[in-house]
Swiss-Prot record:
GO terms for cellular component: plasma membrane. GO terms for biological process: cobalamin biosynthetic process. The gene is cobS1. Signal peptide: none annotated. Joins adenosylcobinamide-GDP and alpha-ribazole to generate adenosylcobalamin (Ado-cobalamin). Also synthesizes adenosylcobalamin 5'-phosphate from adenosylcobinamide-GDP and alpha-ribazole 5'-phosphate. The lineage of its organism: Archaea, Methanobacteriati, Methanobacteriota, Archaeoglobi, Archaeoglobales. This is Adenosylcobinamide-GDP ribazoletransferase. It comes from Archaeoglobus fulgidus (strain ATCC 49558 / DSM 4304 / JCM 9628 / NBRC 100126 / VC-16). Keywords: Cell membrane, Cobalamin biosynthesis, Magnesium, Membrane, Transferase, Transmembrane, Transmembrane helix.
Length: 225
């Protein structure tokens, strides 16, 4: 069971060539936050070795572009007229809003990786995955699809267990600031999605992951010694 969950979570949340059972994953959504520790640790390796400029490339390589694509679609919907927001977030073409979101996103990553420590990179990635968990367990699907399928067995237990990696904050008390920021952004994205789309979609969940990751890194950037 544990090995199946490990394979399923890594296969779903990373580009690693492992096969798993998505049914196992959707019954154990709490694992998202723990996968964040793994992804963050891998991303932080170049920074520890002094090659911080490789962090962005490694991040894209290990996490893929699904969440980034979600951020772009969310950006298009955010800037779209009220009556076209649902159409915009489903549109496969990149619009101006999405391009703006992507440019700002990668600029934040590029500059943040120069200064933040490995701990904050890992913690920011944990917060990003916890954000995804929070949306999947506390909201409703905007329409039928993979997101609704993943949310079918979401329980409060997932949030409780998924919160355990957040205890990393005790190692660096200042980490409470990116933690509070991440929760705030997650709740704002959730509220926005429910008002504009009637719930969350895969793009919304992916966008929340990116927004929280970049935002938390930016907060950590200003906290850096």
């Amino acid at each position: 069971m544990a090995l199946d969950l490990l394979r399923s979570s890594l296969g779903f949340l990373t580009t690693l060539p492992v096969k798993g059972d998505v049914d196992v994953l959707r019954r154990n959504l709490w694992v998202f936050s723990f996968v964040g520790i793994f992804i963050g640790s891998v991303i932080s390796i170049p920074a520890v070795l002094g090659f911080w400029f490789l962090c962005v490339l490694l991040y894209v390589a290990i996490e893929g572009v699904n969440h980034i694509d979600g951020l772009a679609d969310f950006g298009d919907a955010f800037f779209a007229p009220e009556e076209r927001k649902k159409v915009a977030i489903k549109d496969l073409n990149l619009g101006t809003g999405g391009a703006v979101f992507l440019c700002v996103y990668f600029l934040i990553l590029f500059y943040s990786f120069q200064r933040v420590s490995a701990f904050y990179i890992i913690f920011s990635q944990v917060l990003a995955k916890f954000s995804m968990l929070l949306l999947l367990t506390t909201s409703k699907p905007a329409w039928q699809g993979m997101t609704g399928f993943m949310m079918e067995f979401a329980r409060k237990r997932d949030v409780v267990i998924g919160s355990l990696p957040l205890l990393l904050v005790v190692l660096k008390p200042l980490a409470v600031f990116p933690l509070l920021f991440a929760i705030t952004i997650s709740l704002l994205v959730k509220r926005y999605a429910e008002e504009k789309f009637g719930g969350v979609s895969g793009d919304v969940v992916g966008a929340s992951n990116c927004l929280v990751f970049a935002g938390s890194l930016l907060v950590c950037y200003f906290l850096a010694d």
